[in-house]
From Swiss-Prot:
Subcellular location field: Nucleus
Keyword Nucleus: yes
Comp. bias intervals (Polar residues): 170-204, 456-479
Official protein name in the record: Forkhead box protein J2
Species this chain originates from: Xenopus tropicalis (Western clawed frog)
DNA-binding region: 59-150
GO cellular component, one term: nucleus
Function noted in UniProt: Transcriptional activator.
Biased amino acid composition, Low complexity: 311-323
Domain of life: Eukaryota
Comp. bias regions, Acidic residues: 501-512
Gene behind this protein: foxj2
Pfam family of the protein (one): Forkhead
Length: 512
């Protein structure tokens, strides 16, 4: 039984006699008939004549690397061309003469991929074709390159979606934002949304939030965003914003900012006189003048006629059905009607607007422009297409109001801007026996006739003549006079002490 167990395959009694030296000798004896594949172990090994004669009839038991090594070492210069290697193999081993061309491809692959063989260029003084191949005794080891981990298919999908989200992000530079062409449906610049009106009875009541501005398809204000550079527009809007805020000396930046925060449209204080609730009637002789509004022209007035009282009991800020005065020829600054149709004219308009004196303009009427500029300031002037359209629309409203922009042809002036509180009076001054138009005072203290003549005439014993100046040009809204590049001097108004000191030397027929 024990002998059976000792002779079984599971017996390991041979393990103590196993040594490395004996294993190497046994492997050499087993592989003596055929050389192992791969690089040759001895770079200087040569094929003996006995081995060559023993394997002339059949396929030699050598690898292609060993055949190349034997061929190169047989040459006196230890180098051979590819054609010489082919010839040597065919001469020593006739088997490869009729073996086809596949073995030649294997020889070329071994020369190119095996590090033991090195290609040497042919010298200039050696005529012939092809480079030489030599045996490299010290081949360079390849540096182990880190293998790139192949991403999971789910990771590739997530990476593609992330790149798409980055490309669609609004935080890209302004020059990469795709803009609609001129022929597409864009955002025109003409805003006709009405501004909220206020009543004198409750001036602190906040109006409801106004709707988003609507745009109509007006070719005059259709802006082309295809060639625009938004950084330049941002600088222009920023300079306009600071010029509007920096030149409000009389009101102060704090009051203007508070008015924009609360979105209250204050009644104009430097515009023309709101004299629709106070007609110039004369008081009885010797009566002291009553408390006057700081922006109304002082006059000695009496009780109005009964049929005229109902006209002046309405609040002074309700809109009147009046036609504004068209701008007079020759007094415009030359700003074209298509000022915002391209980028060059828009920049030129900013130069004209920035050179004006904004200290005499009541910016509370342009709360939409100031709010748009303030929002752009908070966003560090990174403007998108819709914001540029809103700013251009607000700027066109400002230019139209100040008289810099001529009215659009084919459209009535009253429809090109929101309805604003009236700035001209519909009442009449009294002059004995002569119809007299009511006089209003603009932002520079100049007196001017209203755009529409009064429908009622009255007579009185005496009147107060107001010195008339040349009327400034009106825009299509008829609310603000157009100013030149420098503000005119404020005329000094004379305030008489009594009606006896008035000298009526004014030609009233000249303004009829």
């Amino acid at each position: 039984m024990a002998s059976d167990l000792g002779s079984s395959l599971t017996s390991i009694d041979w393990l103590p006699q196993l040594t490395i030296q004996a294993a190497m000798k046994g492997s050499q004896q087993n592989n003596a008939g055929r050389k192992g594949p791969g690089s040759p172990t001895d770079p200087s090994a040569m094929l003996s004549k006995e081995e060559a004669a023993a394997h002339r009839d059949g396929k030699p038991p050598y690898s292609y690397a060993n055949l190349i090594q034997y061929a190169i070492n047989s040459a006196p210069a230890k180098r051979m061309t590819l054609s010489e290697i082919y010839r040597w193999i065919c001469d020593n081993f006739p088997y490869y003469r009729n073996a086809g061309v596949g073995w030649k491809n294997s020889i070329r692959h071994n020369l190119s991929l095996n590090k033991c063989f090195r290609k040497v260029p042919r010298p200039r003084d050696d005529p012939g074709k092809g480079s030489y191949w030599m045996i490299d005794s010290c081949p360079k080891e390849d540096v182990a390159l880190p293998r790139r981990k192949r991403p999971h298919p789910d990771d590739e999908v997530s990476q593609d979606s992330f790149e798409q989200d980055v490309n669609k992000s609004p935080l890209r530079s302004a020059s990469e934002v795709s803009m609609p062409q001129e022929g597409t449906q864009g955002h025109p610049m003409n805003n006709n949304s009405p501004l909220p009106s206020y009543s004198q009875a409750n001036p602190t009541q906040m109006p409801p939030d106004s709707r988003a501005p609507t745009y109509n398809n007006n070719d005059c204000y259709k802006f082309s965003f295809s060639e625009s550079t938004f950084p330049d527009l941002g600088c222009s809007f920023r300079s306009l914003y600071h010029s509007l805020l920096g030149k409000q000396g009389e009101r102060g930046d704090k009051d203007l900012y508070n008015s924009m925060q609360s979105k209250q449209v204050l009644p104009p204080v430097h515009s023309e006189v709101q004299s629709s609730s106070c007609c110039m009637y004369q008081q009885n002789s010797g009566a002291a003048p009553s408390n006057l509004h700081p922006h109304n022209v002082p006059s000695i007035s009496g009780p109005p006629p009964p049929h005229h009282q109902a006209q002046h009991q309405q609040p002074p800020y309700l809109p009147q059905q009046q036609m504004p005065r068209p701008p007079a020829p020759g007094m415009s600054l030359g700003l074209p009607s298509d000022w915002c149709s391209n980028i060059d004219s828009l920049k030129e308009s900013f130069k004209i607007v920035s050179s004006l004196d904004w200290s005499s303009v009541d910016l509370s009427q342009f709360s939409d422009l100031m709010e748009s500029l303030r929002q752009a300031e908070l966003k560090n002037w990174s403007l998108d297409q819709d914001h540029i359209a809103s700013l251009c629309d607000s700027l066109s409203h400002l230019l139209s109001t100040t008289g810099l922009l001529p009215p659009t042809h084919g459209q009535p002036p009253s429809c090109q801007a929101p309805c604003m509180p009236p700035t001209t009076s519909s009442a009449c001054a009294l002059r004995g026996g002569k119809p007299v138009h009511n006089m209003t005072v603009n932002s520079y203290g100049q007196n001017q006739p209203p755009p529409v003549s009064c429908g009622h005439t009255f007579t009185a014993s005496s009147g107060y003549p107001i010195q008339s100046q040349a009327p400034p040009t009106y825009s299509q809204q008829g609310r603000h006079p157009q100013r030149a590049l420098y503000p005119p001097q404020r005329p000094t108004l004379r305030y008489p002490q009594s009606s006896d000191d008035i000298q009526d030397d004014f030609d009233w027929d000249s303004i009829a």
